[in-house]
Amino acid sequence: MCPLQLRTLLFVGWVVGYVAFLLSIRRMWTGKYIRNPVVRSLLVNMLSDLDTIDVTKWYRCNPDLLEESLRPLFIQNQLDADTRAFVEQSEEKSTYLFTQIYYSLVSTILSPLVSRTSINGFLGRGSMFVFSKNQFQQLLQIEPDWVADRLLDLGAGDGGVTKVMAPHFTEVYVTEVSLTMKRRLRKKKFKLLGIDAWQETGFKYDVISCLNLLDRCDDPLRLLKDIRQSLVPGTGRLIMAAVIPFQPWLEIGGRWERPREYIKIQGKTWEEQVNGLTNEVFRKVGFEVESFTRLPYLCEGDIARDYYLLDDAVFVLKSSDDQVAAP
Protein backbone atom coordinates (compact mmCIF):
# COMPACT_ATOMS: atom_id res chain seq x y z
CA MET A 1 0.00 0.00 0.00
CA CYS A 2 1.46 3.34 -1.06
CA PRO A 3 1.71 6.30 1.39
CA LEU A 4 -1.15 8.18 -0.32
CA GLN A 5 -3.49 5.20 0.01
CA LEU A 6 -2.48 4.78 3.65
CA ARG A 7 -3.19 8.43 4.42
CA THR A 8 -6.54 8.18 2.65
CA LEU A 9 -7.44 5.05 4.59
CA LEU A 10 -6.46 6.68 7.89
CA PHE A 11 -8.51 9.78 7.08
CA VAL A 12 -11.58 7.73 6.18
CA GLY A 13 -11.15 5.72 9.37
CA TRP A 14 -10.91 8.92 11.39
CA VAL A 15 -14.08 10.32 9.81
CA VAL A 16 -15.99 7.08 10.46
CA GLY A 17 -14.79 7.02 14.06
CA TYR A 18 -15.70 10.68 14.51
CA VAL A 19 -19.22 10.15 13.15
CA ALA A 20 -19.68 7.14 15.42
CA PHE A 21 -18.57 9.24 18.38
CA LEU A 22 -21.05 12.00 17.51
CA LEU A 23 -23.87 9.50 17.20
CA SER A 24 -23.02 8.02 20.59
CA ILE A 25 -22.96 11.50 22.13
CA ARG A 26 -26.36 12.27 20.62
CA ARG A 27 -27.65 8.98 22.01
CA MET A 28 -26.24 9.62 25.47
CA TRP A 29 -27.67 13.14 25.59
CA THR A 30 -31.16 11.69 25.42
CA GLY A 31 -30.73 10.87 29.09
CA LYS A 32 -31.31 7.12 28.78
CA TYR A 33 -27.66 6.27 29.41
CA ILE A 34 -27.05 8.71 32.26
CA ARG A 35 -27.10 6.95 35.62
CA ASN A 36 -26.93 9.97 37.91
CA PRO A 37 -30.60 10.92 38.44
CA VAL A 38 -29.82 14.60 39.08
CA VAL A 39 -27.77 15.01 35.89
CA ARG A 40 -30.27 12.98 33.92
CA SER A 41 -33.14 15.18 35.12
CA LEU A 42 -31.21 18.32 34.15
CA LEU A 43 -30.41 17.09 30.65
CA VAL A 44 -33.92 15.86 29.99
CA ASN A 45 -35.21 19.24 31.11
CA MET A 46 -32.91 21.02 28.65
CA LEU A 47 -33.88 18.83 25.73
CA SER A 48 -37.59 18.40 26.37
CA ASP A 49 -40.41 19.81 24.36
CA LEU A 50 -41.54 23.30 25.35
CA ASP A 51 -44.90 21.95 26.46
CA THR A 52 -43.28 19.70 29.06
CA ILE A 53 -40.87 22.13 30.75
CA ASP A 54 -41.42 25.15 32.98
CA VAL A 55 -40.53 28.01 30.63
CA THR A 56 -41.74 30.60 33.14
CA LYS A 57 -38.34 30.33 34.84
CA TRP A 58 -36.82 31.87 31.70
CA TYR A 59 -38.63 35.10 32.55
CA ARG A 60 -38.88 34.97 36.35
CA CYS A 61 -37.75 37.86 38.53
CA ASN A 62 -37.96 38.27 42.31
CA PRO A 63 -38.59 42.01 42.81
CA ASP A 64 -37.71 41.75 46.50
CA LEU A 65 -34.07 41.18 45.48
CA LEU A 66 -33.97 44.26 43.25
CA GLU A 67 -32.97 47.62 44.63
CA GLU A 68 -36.03 49.76 45.27
CA SER A 69 -35.49 52.21 42.39
CA LEU A 70 -35.43 49.36 39.84
CA ARG A 71 -38.57 47.52 40.92
CA PRO A 72 -41.13 49.65 39.02
CA LEU A 73 -38.97 49.55 35.88
CA PHE A 74 -39.12 45.77 35.41
CA ILE A 75 -41.28 44.49 32.53
CA GLN A 76 -42.61 40.96 32.95
CA ASN A 77 -42.44 38.85 29.79
CA GLN A 78 -43.49 35.34 28.85
CA LEU A 79 -43.07 32.80 26.08
CA ASP A 80 -44.68 34.24 22.96
CA ALA A 81 -45.34 32.95 19.45
CA ASP A 82 -42.08 34.24 17.92
CA THR A 83 -39.93 32.72 20.67
CA ARG A 84 -41.75 29.41 20.42
CA ALA A 85 -41.30 29.39 16.64
CA PHE A 86 -37.53 29.93 16.98
CA VAL A 87 -37.17 27.08 19.49
CA GLU A 88 -39.28 24.70 17.42
CA GLN A 89 -37.28 25.55 14.29
CA SER A 90 -34.05 24.90 16.20
CA GLU A 91 -35.39 21.56 17.41
CA GLU A 92 -36.24 20.59 13.84
CA LYS A 93 -32.81 21.59 12.50
CA SER A 94 -31.05 19.54 15.18
CA THR A 95 -32.69 16.40 13.75
CA TYR A 96 -31.00 16.87 10.35
CA LEU A 97 -28.41 14.22 11.19
CA PHE A 98 -26.05 14.40 8.22
CA THR A 99 -26.16 18.20 8.16
CA GLN A 100 -25.27 18.32 11.85
CA ILE A 101 -22.44 15.81 11.36
CA TYR A 102 -21.06 18.00 8.56
CA TYR A 103 -21.32 21.12 10.76
CA SER A 104 -19.57 19.36 13.63
CA LEU A 105 -16.78 18.06 11.41
CA VAL A 106 -16.09 21.48 9.87
CA SER A 107 -16.23 23.16 13.30
CA THR A 108 -13.71 20.69 14.71
CA ILE A 109 -11.29 21.31 11.84
CA LEU A 110 -11.59 25.11 11.84
CA SER A 111 -11.95 25.87 15.55
CA PRO A 112 -8.17 26.05 16.24
CA LEU A 113 -7.85 28.63 13.45
CA VAL A 114 -10.87 30.96 13.55
CA SER A 115 -13.56 32.06 15.98
CA ARG A 116 -16.77 30.15 16.49
CA THR A 117 -18.68 33.19 15.20
CA SER A 118 -16.81 33.06 11.89
CA ILE A 119 -17.36 29.31 11.63
CA ASN A 120 -21.09 29.78 12.15
CA GLY A 121 -21.12 32.54 9.53
CA PHE A 122 -19.35 30.27 7.04
CA LEU A 123 -21.79 27.42 7.70
CA GLY A 124 -24.88 29.63 7.80
CA ARG A 125 -25.86 28.37 11.25
CA GLY A 126 -25.90 29.51 14.88
CA SER A 127 -28.67 32.12 14.64
CA MET A 128 -29.49 33.94 17.87
CA PHE A 129 -32.77 35.06 19.38
CA VAL A 130 -32.91 37.84 22.00
CA PHE A 131 -36.42 39.26 21.75
CA SER A 132 -39.49 39.11 19.56
CA LYS A 133 -41.07 42.04 17.74
CA ASN A 134 -43.68 42.51 20.47
CA GLN A 135 -41.11 42.23 23.26
CA PHE A 136 -38.94 44.86 21.55
CA GLN A 137 -41.86 47.26 21.24
CA GLN A 138 -42.90 46.72 24.84
CA LEU A 139 -39.37 47.21 26.12
CA LEU A 140 -38.84 50.44 24.18
CA GLN A 141 -42.44 51.53 24.98
CA ILE A 142 -43.31 52.28 21.36
CA GLU A 143 -46.33 51.67 19.14
CA PRO A 144 -46.21 49.21 16.21
CA ASP A 145 -46.17 52.10 13.71
CA TRP A 146 -43.42 54.10 15.48
CA VAL A 147 -40.51 54.99 13.17
CA ALA A 148 -37.26 56.85 13.87
CA ASP A 149 -34.34 57.82 11.66
CA ARG A 150 -31.34 55.67 12.59
CA LEU A 151 -30.59 52.38 14.32
CA LEU A 152 -27.06 51.12 14.99
CA ASP A 153 -26.67 47.46 15.97
CA LEU A 154 -23.19 46.81 17.36
CA GLY A 155 -21.86 43.29 16.84
CA ALA A 156 -24.88 42.36 14.74
CA GLY A 157 -23.82 38.79 13.94
CA ASP A 158 -25.94 37.37 11.13
CA GLY A 159 -28.49 40.20 11.46
CA GLY A 160 -31.29 38.01 12.78
CA VAL A 161 -31.99 40.25 15.78
CA THR A 162 -31.33 43.38 13.71
CA LYS A 163 -34.14 42.28 11.41
CA VAL A 164 -36.58 42.36 14.35
CA MET A 165 -35.76 46.01 15.07
CA ALA A 166 -35.24 47.24 11.50
CA PRO A 167 -38.90 48.00 10.55
CA HIS A 168 -38.93 50.86 13.06
CA PHE A 169 -36.06 52.77 11.43
CA THR A 170 -35.44 54.54 8.14
CA GLU A 171 -31.73 53.67 8.13
CA VAL A 172 -30.16 50.60 9.74
CA TYR A 173 -26.43 50.52 10.44
CA VAL A 174 -24.47 47.53 11.76
CA THR A 175 -20.96 46.62 12.86
CA GLU A 176 -19.36 43.19 12.95
CA VAL A 177 -15.83 41.79 13.27
CA SER A 178 -16.33 38.41 11.58
CA LEU A 179 -15.77 38.47 7.80
CA THR A 180 -18.26 35.66 7.19
CA MET A 181 -20.94 37.43 9.22
CA LYS A 182 -20.23 40.68 7.33
CA ARG A 183 -21.12 38.92 4.09
CA ARG A 184 -24.43 37.78 5.58
CA LEU A 185 -25.19 41.32 6.78
CA ARG A 186 -24.50 42.77 3.34
CA LYS A 187 -26.88 40.25 1.79
CA LYS A 188 -29.59 41.59 4.10
CA LYS A 189 -28.89 45.14 2.82
CA PHE A 190 -27.83 46.59 6.18
CA LYS A 191 -25.31 49.45 6.09
CA LEU A 192 -22.04 48.09 7.40
CA LEU A 193 -19.73 50.40 9.36
CA GLY A 194 -16.20 49.82 10.59
CA ILE A 195 -15.86 48.84 14.24
CA ASP A 196 -13.87 52.05 14.86
CA ALA A 197 -15.85 54.29 12.50
CA TRP A 198 -19.46 54.21 13.73
CA GLN A 199 -18.90 57.06 16.22
CA GLU A 200 -17.23 59.24 13.57
CA THR A 201 -19.97 59.37 10.93
CA GLY A 202 -21.00 62.96 11.68
CA PHE A 203 -24.55 62.03 12.73
CA LYS A 204 -26.26 60.65 15.83
CA TYR A 205 -28.37 57.51 16.30
CA ASP A 206 -31.89 57.32 17.69
CA VAL A 207 -31.28 53.84 19.06
CA ILE A 208 -28.06 51.89 19.54
CA SER A 209 -28.30 48.21 20.40
CA CYS A 210 -25.45 46.44 22.18
CA LEU A 211 -26.72 42.90 22.61
CA ASN A 212 -24.53 40.44 24.53
CA LEU A 213 -21.42 42.32 23.44
CA LEU A 214 -20.28 44.06 26.64
CA ASP A 215 -18.83 40.85 28.11
CA ARG A 216 -16.95 40.19 24.85
CA CYS A 217 -15.35 43.64 24.65
CA ASP A 218 -11.76 44.55 25.53
CA ASP A 219 -12.69 48.05 26.75
CA PRO A 220 -16.37 47.94 27.83
CA LEU A 221 -16.52 51.24 29.75
CA ARG A 222 -14.96 53.11 26.82
CA LEU A 223 -17.54 51.50 24.54
CA LEU A 224 -20.41 52.69 26.75
CA LYS A 225 -19.03 56.23 26.83
CA ASP A 226 -18.73 56.28 23.03
CA ILE A 227 -22.31 55.02 22.74
CA ARG A 228 -23.55 57.76 25.07
CA GLN A 229 -21.85 60.41 22.94
CA SER A 230 -23.33 58.96 19.73
CA LEU A 231 -27.00 59.00 20.76
CA VAL A 232 -29.43 61.74 19.75
CA PRO A 233 -29.51 64.11 22.77
CA GLY A 234 -32.68 63.81 24.82
CA THR A 235 -34.47 61.04 22.94
CA GLY A 236 -31.65 58.63 22.07
CA ARG A 237 -31.76 55.23 23.76
CA LEU A 238 -29.37 52.32 24.26
CA ILE A 239 -30.70 48.77 24.27
CA MET A 240 -28.27 46.72 26.30
CA ALA A 241 -28.44 42.94 26.72
CA ALA A 242 -26.05 41.18 29.08
CA VAL A 243 -25.75 37.49 29.90
CA ILE A 244 -26.20 36.77 33.61
CA PRO A 245 -23.95 35.86 35.36
CA PHE A 246 -21.73 38.50 33.77
CA GLN A 247 -18.43 36.81 32.85
CA PRO A 248 -16.20 38.81 30.47
CA TRP A 249 -13.99 36.85 28.06
CA LEU A 250 -12.64 37.50 24.57
CA GLU A 251 -12.54 34.94 21.77
CA ILE A 252 -9.33 35.43 19.79
CA GLY A 253 -8.43 32.95 17.06
CA GLY A 254 -10.32 30.13 18.73
CA ARG A 255 -8.84 30.92 22.18
CA TRP A 256 -10.52 32.58 25.16
CA GLU A 257 -8.65 35.41 26.87
CA ARG A 258 -9.43 37.84 29.67
CA PRO A 259 -10.21 41.41 28.47
CA ARG A 260 -7.85 44.26 29.25
CA GLU A 261 -10.57 46.08 31.21
CA TYR A 262 -12.16 43.38 33.37
CA ILE A 263 -15.49 44.15 35.06
CA LYS A 264 -16.48 41.96 37.99
CA ILE A 265 -20.14 42.23 39.00
CA GLN A 266 -21.13 41.37 42.55
CA GLY A 267 -24.08 39.10 43.32
CA LYS A 268 -25.06 35.49 42.74
CA THR A 269 -28.69 35.80 41.64
CA TRP A 270 -30.02 37.32 38.43
CA GLU A 271 -31.53 40.19 40.41
CA GLU A 272 -28.34 40.92 42.36
CA GLN A 273 -26.34 41.04 39.15
CA VAL A 274 -28.86 43.46 37.65
CA ASN A 275 -28.32 45.69 40.68
CA GLY A 276 -24.57 45.39 40.19
CA LEU A 277 -24.63 46.25 36.49
CA THR A 278 -26.81 49.27 37.19
CA ASN A 279 -24.68 50.67 40.00
CA GLU A 280 -21.18 49.53 39.06
CA VAL A 281 -21.33 50.03 35.29
CA PHE A 282 -24.25 52.01 33.83
CA ARG A 283 -24.41 54.84 36.36
CA LYS A 284 -20.64 55.24 36.39
CA VAL A 285 -20.61 56.11 32.68
CA GLY A 286 -23.65 58.38 32.75
CA PHE A 287 -26.58 56.06 31.97
CA GLU A 288 -29.73 55.37 33.92
CA VAL A 289 -32.20 52.52 33.48
CA GLU A 290 -35.53 53.38 31.86
CA SER A 291 -36.87 49.81 31.69
CA PHE A 292 -35.55 46.26 31.79
CA THR A 293 -36.68 42.66 31.53
CA ARG A 294 -35.50 39.07 31.80
CA LEU A 295 -35.41 37.06 28.57
CA PRO A 296 -33.85 33.81 27.35
CA TYR A 297 -30.87 34.29 25.05
CA LEU A 298 -31.38 31.46 22.57
CA CYS A 299 -29.08 29.96 19.98
CA GLU A 300 -29.66 27.26 17.40
CA GLY A 301 -28.50 23.85 18.57
CA ASP A 302 -26.33 21.11 17.14
CA ILE A 303 -26.01 17.33 17.22
CA ALA A 304 -25.81 17.36 21.04
CA ARG A 305 -28.58 19.81 21.94
CA ASP A 306 -31.72 21.08 20.26
CA TYR A 307 -30.95 24.64 21.32
CA TYR A 308 -28.69 26.55 23.71
CA LEU A 309 -30.02 28.93 26.33
CA LEU A 310 -28.52 31.60 28.59
CA ASP A 311 -30.16 34.09 30.96
CA ASP A 312 -30.27 37.64 29.62
CA ALA A 313 -30.97 40.94 31.31
CA VAL A 314 -32.15 43.39 28.64
CA PHE A 315 -32.12 47.11 29.50
CA VAL A 316 -33.27 50.31 27.88
CA LEU A 317 -30.82 52.99 29.01
CA LYS A 318 -30.89 56.76 28.62
CA SER A 319 -28.30 59.40 29.37
CA SER A 320 -28.47 60.67 32.95
CA ASP A 321 -28.60 64.20 31.52
CA ASP A 322 -31.78 63.54 29.51
CA GLN A 323 -34.87 65.33 30.70
CA VAL A 324 -37.04 64.38 27.73
CA ALA A 325 -39.63 61.58 27.86
CA ALA A 326 -39.10 58.28 26.12
CA PRO A 327 -39.74 58.09 22.34
Write out the residue ranges for each language-model feature.
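N-terminal accessory regions of S-adenosyl-L-methionine
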Residues: 2-147, 160, 242, 250-327
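Conserved acidic residues
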Residues: 149, 170, 206
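Class I SAM-dependent methyltransferase SAM/SAH-binding core
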Residues: 152, 157-199
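A conserved beta-strand element that flanks and buttresses the S-adenosyl-L-methionine
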Residues: 209
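A short His-aromatic
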Residues: 212-216
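A short glycine-rich, Lys/Arg-flanked "PGG" loop and its adjoining helix->strand segment in the class I
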Residues: 222-236
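Conserved beta-strand signature within the Rossmann-like core of class I S-adenosyl-L-methionine
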Residues: 235-244
